[in-house]
């Protein structure tokens, strides 16, 4: 973000009377996914940078339930008397508003990622809703689709296995596929169905697609890595090898599969940084280190970074991001970010 990507100048007149030692929580889907584990590892790195132990980061695991997400956050607000900072993926977009309103009403602070409705903005809620970060998934998903279509020889049938239908990233990743299809008239989208980001559901859905479409399927576009693992299992069960498949998230297992040629591509969103910086924004706003309403809008709603990973660069990518996790300055809030969110 050019000149905007500088650490906040702490101290001096920026400091305000606020919460001296806020409890810190991350509200997220599950620990079964390498993606969410990496998000949490970022949150743990943030609390360790504050001289706290990893287990001082409270995990509010919603198990894919928006109702549980909201209930757990309300319980945490009650337990802490609102003296807390929360990082959160609201699970689906409509749930973000009741979550951030509950946080505001308790006098706590929250930063969100991925899911919110387009009409909900931090500056409309106030300083207690510090920031929202998402990732601009449409273009990277279009890139993976083009890689897939080239591998298919520009013809044949493709199926898409998506995330939770109401999730912003699920919508954007399917849109990316559809954008790429416009340039490939000889490729047919046979079907697109949600697999809820889940490996088991990915296996079941791919098995169903194979039953319905058989050898009409010549390529598979997956909304995340977990789904792709399930697709590979379903194909293996039918003795199908070398099916072109693309995925998304850049998890370690997926990068290994890219290096082995079992996946054509995945997209990395740096969840470790995302998990740490989202918690950091909420924490430092809560302590009064900065006042969100004094920041420009591109610091309240912004895109996170994305990196396309293909076989030719997978080894270098693995060495840079996975073999040793980079260390980050958790006060450099917007360093790797990618500009203000744009709405259609």
Question: How should each PLM-predicted stretch be described?
Answer:
Residues 35-52, 140-144, 168-188, 201, ...:
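Short, solvent-exposed amphipathic alpha-helices that sit
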Residues 240, 246-309:
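Flexible loop/turn connectors
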Residues 99-139, 157, 251-257, 263-264:
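Flexible loop/hinge segments that line or gate small-molecule binding clefts
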Residues 43, 69, 85-108, 177, ...:
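Hydrophobic alpha-helical
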Residues 161, 165, 180, 281-344:
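Hinge/cleft segment of the Venus flytrap/periplasmic-binding protein
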Residues 69, 131-158, 202-203, 254, ...:
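Hydrophobic alpha-helical segments within soluble ligand-binding/sensing domains
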Residues 1-14:
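N-terminal export signals
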Residues 21-42, 46-50, 57-74, 87-94, ...:
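Extracytoplasmic "Venus flytrap"
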């Amino acid at each position: 973000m050019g000149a905007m990507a500088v650490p906040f100048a702490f101290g001096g007149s920026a400091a305000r009377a606020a919460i001296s030692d806020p409890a810190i929580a991350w509200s997220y889907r599950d620990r079964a996914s390498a993606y969410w584990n990496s998000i949490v590892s970022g949150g743990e790195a943030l609390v360790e940078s504050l001289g706290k132990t990893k287990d001082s980061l409270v995990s509010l695991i919603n198990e894919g339930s928006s109702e549980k997400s909201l209930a757990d956050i309300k319980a945490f607000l009650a337990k802490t008397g609102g003296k807390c900072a929360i990082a959160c993926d609201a699970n689906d977009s409509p749930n973000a508003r009741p979550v951030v309103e509950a946080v505001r009403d308790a006098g706590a602070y929250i930063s969100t990622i991925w899911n919110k409705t387009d009409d909900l903005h931090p500056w409309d809620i106030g300083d207690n809703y510090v920031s929202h970060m998402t990732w601009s998934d449409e273009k990277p998903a279009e890139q993976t689709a083009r890689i897939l279509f080239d591998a298919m020889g520009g013809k044949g049938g493709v199926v898409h296995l998506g995330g939770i239908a109401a999730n912003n990233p699920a919508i954007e990743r399917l849109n990316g596929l559809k954008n790429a299809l416009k340039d490939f008239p000889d490729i047919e989208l046979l079907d697109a169905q949600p697999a809820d980001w889940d490996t088991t559901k990915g296996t079941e859905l791919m098995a169903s697609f194979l039953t319905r479409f058989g050898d009409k399927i010549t390529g598979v576009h997956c909304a995340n890595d977990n789904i792709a693992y399930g697709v590979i299992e379903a194909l293996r069960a039918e003795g199908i090898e070398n099916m072109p498949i693309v995925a998304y998230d850049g998890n370690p297992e997926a990068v290994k599969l890219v290096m082995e040629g079992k996946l054509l591509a995945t997209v990395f969103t740096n969840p470790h940084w995302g998990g740490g910086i989202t918690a950091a924004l909420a924490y430092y706003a809560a302590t009064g280190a900065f006042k969100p309403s004094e920041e420009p809008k591109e610091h309240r709603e912004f895109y996170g970074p994305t990196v396309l990973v293909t076989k030719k660069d997978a080894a270098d990518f693995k060495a840079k991001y996975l073999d040793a996790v980079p260390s980050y300055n958790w006060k450099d809030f917007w360093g790797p970010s990618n500009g203000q969110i744009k709405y259609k």
